[in-house]
Amino acid sequence: MRLVIARCSVDYVGRLTAHLPSAVRLVLVKADGSVSIHADGRAYKPLNWMSPPCVIAEADGVWRVTNRAAEQLVITLEQVLHDSTHDLGVDPGLRKDGVEAHLQVLLADRPDAIAPGLTLVRREYETGIGPVDLLCRDADGSTVAVEIKRRGEIDGVEQLTRYLVRLEADPALPHPVRGILAAQSITPQARLLAADRGLGCAVVDYDELRGLEPSIPTLF
């Protein structure tokens, strides 16, 4: 991971345009190829970012970050205060809570509950940056990566996107490769981002998968 703290301005050119005026910011360049710009606020959320895969061209204090859709982040560095690179190694990822772990087991037995025609290839398929929950095959023989969450949010979409970049480069897998975020509930923001990236969303019923009757209020 490369950490650059600099006074900079940022311009995004793509489906729309956006401009961040000059200020001191943190620029993160991760091993997966993503680039994000952060201020000293907004918790973990970046001011702007470019998801992998992308190409970074540096020249005369200007970074041009371009993705496959030809969208660009242009970062103009006026004063670099810090620039360092660190090898963080392979992250083991978050341990799933009890419900997520059980959902993974249940959906591995019933991948068709995610999408008709899915069959399981392997659970916990290693990508090099963490394991994708379920690696499946659809009726056409294409590879489908499934990330399972209790609640589907933007973080889950980002995680699945990173896995897909690795899987698309895996010559051992049948192509094309697509992804599905499966969860008990999925936020509108996550659905929008998933659709923008060509990912599928599947809402699964935990109780139904466990063979339980739905909870219906009664008078007695």
Curated annotation (Swiss-Prot):
Presence of keyword ATP-binding: no
Any one GO MF annotation of this record: single-stranded DNA endodeoxyribonuclease activity
Main location: cytoplasm
Compartment annotation: Cytoplasm
GO cellular component: cytoplasm
CDD domains per UniProt: NucS-like
UniProt cross-references to InterPro entries, sorted A to Z: Endonuclease_NucS, NucS_C, NucS_N, NucS_N_sf, tRNA_endonuc-like_dom_sf
Family: Belongs to the NucS endonuclease family.
Protein name (Swiss-Prot/TrEMBL): Endonuclease NucS
Gene name per UniProt: nucS
